[in-house]
Regions:
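Membrane-lumen/periplasm interface segments of specific transmembrane helices
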Residues: 117, 142-211, 236, 251, ...
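Hydrophobic, aromatic-rich transmembrane alpha-helices
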Residues: 34-41, 130-135, 191-222, 226, ...
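Membrane-interface alpha helices of multi-pass inner-membrane proteins
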Residues: 55-57, 83, 103-120, 127-132, ...
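Signature aromatic-anchored transmembrane alpha helix within multi-pass, membrane-resident enzymes
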Residues: 49-54, 102-107, 127, 145-153, ...
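Multi-pass, polyprenyl lipid-linked donor-dependent membrane glycosyltransferases
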Residues: 21-29, 57-84, 89, 115-126, ...
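Transmembrane-helix signature of polytopic, membrane-embedded enzymes
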Residues: 34-61, 79-80, 100, 222-227
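Transmembrane-helix motifs of polytopic, lipid-linked glycan transferases
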Residues: 24-46, 80, 84, 88, ...
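Loop-to-helix entry region of an early transmembrane alpha helix in multi-pass inner-membrane enzymes
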Residues: 2-9, 14-32, 68, 72, ...
Length: 326
């Protein structure tokens, strides 16, 4: 996809191949994602406000997210534009009626969703979220189709201007086996404890049970987010690769539903009793995340490894020169 290269294009024009400038783009995108999450039109309501604040406390101090600032990859830009897309969809469709003043915004929404999908192709699930959101609000009329029409026009321009990839994504499904599916399910099940640095595997069961409960009770309000999350997880289960970075933009949604489900379970015991259970446990999770992140940030780090090579080193520059020549 051409979305991320286009984001880096201004940096290349201004600074050349400067990896520090590329990483600044990652920092801006990560901060931008947090801002869009905080000001989300639905999540900013009283019912979700505490959940969002707790999620941001888990994310802003989590070295898992800040660690991606040190790499030039599409995860953080996609995370930012995904949150921007959710913010825009909920902002436009918070009211059921369509107005002429919003016509240009509906066109812009289609362009935004398409560009997000051009950063990472799982972003195309946003169009499914949009369809469900429009259907839920019973939106009719020609403006209903504007986001799709504008996205289709931009897609046509992209196909004319930019070359396509060497293969199709559907080619990857040819190597999927039942073993892959079972392995992915097991691996994904274990991710929450890894992301939150919890040494107890039983926490994963606790997390996913509450996440599913929160998804069930919050899906009517967070329709677009619920549809996108379920669709993408189903794709990743069937995907032949189990890379944790694919989940970087999904975990904030999982955390929100987890806290919503956990709050509901706690409130079943009574409002006061629930708070005495909810906040200490979430507080322990936040302290665990921040403790590990501070320890990691203050420890000597081996900067260059086989996974994170020195892309500005002499051998790397020789390889780039060879590729440019040939």
């Amino acid at each position: 996809p051409w979305g991320y290269p286009l984001l880096l294009f201004p940096c290349v024009v201004l600074f050349g191949i400067n990896y520090f400038a590329f990483k600044i783009v990652g920092v801006i995108c990560l901060v931008g994602a947090f801002i869009f999450l905080y000001y989300h039109p639905i999540l900013s309501k009283e019912r979700f406000r505490m959940s969002v604040l707790l999620v941001l406390a888990l994310l802003t101090g989590n070295i898992f997210y800040w660690g991606y600032v040190n790499s030039v990859s599409s995860e953080l830009p996609f995370f930012c534009f995904l949150m921007f897309s959710f913010w825009t969809m909920n902002k436009l469709y918070a009211l059921k009626e369509q107005t002429e003043k919003r016509t240009i915004l509906y066109i812009g929404l289609g362009i935004l969703l398409f560009f997000t999908a051009q950063i990472r192709t799982e972003g195309y699930f946003l169009f499914i979220s949009l369809i469900v959101l429009q259907w839920k609000n019973r939106l009719l009329g020609w403006r209903f189709f504007l986001p799709y029409a504008s996205a289709l026009c931009i897609w046509f321009v992209f196909t004319l201007v930019f070359p396509s990839g060497y293969t199709e994504h559907f080619e990857h499904f040819k190597v999927v086996t039942l073993t892959n599916l079972l392995h992915n399910i097991q691996t994904f099940y274990e991710y929450p404890a890894q992301i939150l640095y919890i040494p107890f595997s039983l926490f994963n069961l606790f997390f996913w049970v509450n996440c599913l409960l929160g998804l069930y009770i919050s899906s009517r309000k967070l329709t677009a987010e619920s549809v996108y999350l379920v669709s993408t997880i189903m794709l990743l289960i069937c995907w032949p690769y189990d890379v944790i970075r694919y989940w970087l933009s999904l975990f904030p949604l999982c955390f929100i539903f987890f806290i919503q489900g956990f709050r509901f379970m706690c409130m079943v015991w009574g409002k006061k009793a629930g708070k005495w259970v909810l906040y200490p446990i979430i507080g322990i999770l936040i302290c665990s995340v921040w403790k590990v992140s501070i320890k990691y940030a203050t420890s000597p780090i081996q900067i260059y490894t086989t996974i994170n090579p020195n892309v500005e080193g002499e051998s790397a520059q020789e390889m780039y020169a060879f590729l440019r020549t040939n």
